[in-house]
């Protein structure tokens, strides 16, 4: 959790829909997207970039690399310091909006994964810059986690459908609104790592839809997500060991793949529409803004832009709490 002086703590509310955020006039895209990879800029101030163009990349490590994409079309106006989602400070590239969009507003037919091999899916995940946000303050490349988990004899993946911190709502709301896509993204990852099965861990109050029959085993378990802690690796492993009688779940360990609904939604969108990570759903609320919601915003959108989209600040806030 990162706290900035001057904005109030978040509140919980019930939401009926998601909202597409305004396209900002400019964005500041962090160079560092995950905790391990060090990227280098591929463009410089004055260059013109398109939406979805790769603007930074890291060296390959066992074939895995980190990549950063421009979330909007425009002109690179400078390099400046910015705060990453996990609270670290790094270089950021400011891009001024200009030109036409490649993805925004385009209707594309989802790709059919049935004819794709696990290797093809893995390469797509690796190329599109998908970050596994299961551990919020230690984001890592999903491809890196898949590669590590796939090395196990009987690899298992666990998908948490709620936020590990009860004060947050992002993953819970994504599960509520996009469970079908989260499920599809999970199947893609399972195929990419040749998983023995998928374990979905949901809040006890969440009504799981009836799941279509799959070739891969799927197990759904529920827990009290309002109890802290309940969504970390240790708690999920204990939950599985206590409640599962499925033989394939016996191999679950800290070396298994643990991920969340946000990451699985990103995976679905990246593979199905060939779309790199250029936007993200965020939950924003507080008693100093007149509205709150789950908003899809461009990567690099500032907190000021978010506040303005919720009606602007109505009073001087006490603190901004990010990821908490």
Residue ranges and their predicted role:
Residues 1-42, 57, 221:
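N-terminal, Lys/Arg-enriched amphipathic/low-complexity engagement segments
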Residues 135, 148-151, 196-303, 309-316, ...:
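Hydrophobic alpha-helical positions that pack around
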